[in-house]
Curated annotation (Swiss-Prot):
Tissue spec. comment: Expressed ubiquitously.
UniProt name for this protein: Tropomyosin-1
Record lineage: Eukaryota, Metazoa, Cnidaria, Hydrozoa, Hydroidolina
Keywords from the named record: Coiled coil, Repeat
Coiled coil: 1-242
Subunit structure: Homodimer.
Pfam family, one: Tropomyosin
Stretches with biased composition (Basic and acidic residues): 13-23, 70-96
UniProt comment concerning the protein's domains: The molecule is in a coiled coil structure that is formed by 2 polypeptide chains. The sequence exhibits a prominent seven-residues periodicity.
Organism name: Podocoryna carnea
Gene behind the chain: TPM1
UniProt record similarity statement: Belongs to the tropomyosin family.
Membrane-spanning intervals of the chain: none
Disordered: annotated span: 1-31, 65-96
Length: 242
């Protein structure tokens, strides 16, 4: 009987130990399940965090791409700005060189214009002088021509008087009633008129020579006037084409 009690007691003890082990195992399983649940929750949270990080990474990559594109655009604009600045510098240098060239050309044109104006003034004075000489020569030729015409009339009159005196002298020499004094007086008048006629002829020749000289001088004055006018027209044409 005691053996049975001992055996039952041993079995009870084993049963209690088994129950305890089962309880411990259950507790451990519960703890493990709780830990697994916590781990799963943590995994979910980590998964969510990872997804958020991936979204943030995508957003960051998108922003980086946008910033890269913007940087490239800004760099392109900066390069264009540097190129434009360089072109402006080159253009500025070109414009400066062109300005210097234009200033030099302007100075040359101004100097040429001053020379032309001075030459124009000289030609104008020369033209006025030639006009004055031409007027004087024309007046002189007109006066000489009038004197020649007057002498021609005078020569004709003296010739007529000489012929009349010769006729009277012939009549006087044929008339027996003419006195010697009247003959001498007639001869003296004849000589006076003849001298006057000779003088008129000499003066006529001188005036004709002077008239010829005057014509030559008038032609020379007209030629000089024409040349001065041609020079003036040519200079004005050059001045207009500048």
């Amino acid at each position: 009987m005691d053996a049975i009690k001992k055996k039952m007691s041993a079995m009870k003890t084993k049963l209690e130990e088994a129950d305890k082990q089962a309880q411990d195992a259950e507790d451990e399983l519960t703890a493990t399940l709780e830990k697994a649940a916590e781990t799963e929750q943590t995994a979910d949270e980590l998964q969510k965090t990872l997804a958020d990080l991936e979204d943030e990474l995508d957003a960051a990559e998108s922003r980086l791409t946008s910033l890269t594109e913007k940087y490239n655009e800004e760099e392109k604009k900066a390069e264009e700005g540097r190129r434009a600045h360089k072109e402006l510098e080159n253009r500025g240098q070109t414009d400066y060189s062109r300005l210097n060239r234009l200033e030099t050309e302007l100075a040359e044109i101004t100097e040429q214009n001053e020379v032309v104006v001075e030459k124009l003034s000289e030609l104008s004075s020369q033209l006025e002088e030639n006009e004055r000489i031409l007027d004087e020569e024309e007046e002189r030729c007109a006066t000489a021509d009038a004197q020649v015409k007057e002498l021609e009339v005078d020569v004709v009159q003296v010739g007529n008087q000489l012929r009349s005196m010769e006729i009277n002298e012939e009549k006087a020499s044929k008339s027996n009633d003419q006195s010697a004094n009247k003959l001498e007086d007639t001869i003296e008048k004849y000589n006076t008129i003849k001298d006057r006629a000779d003088d008129a002829e000499a003066r006529s020749r001188d005036l004709e020579a002077e008239l010829n000289e005057c014509d030559d001088e008038l032609a020379a004055a007209k030629e000089a006037y024409g040349q001065s006018k041609a020079d003036m027209d040519e200079l004005l044409l050059e001045l207009a084409s500048m």
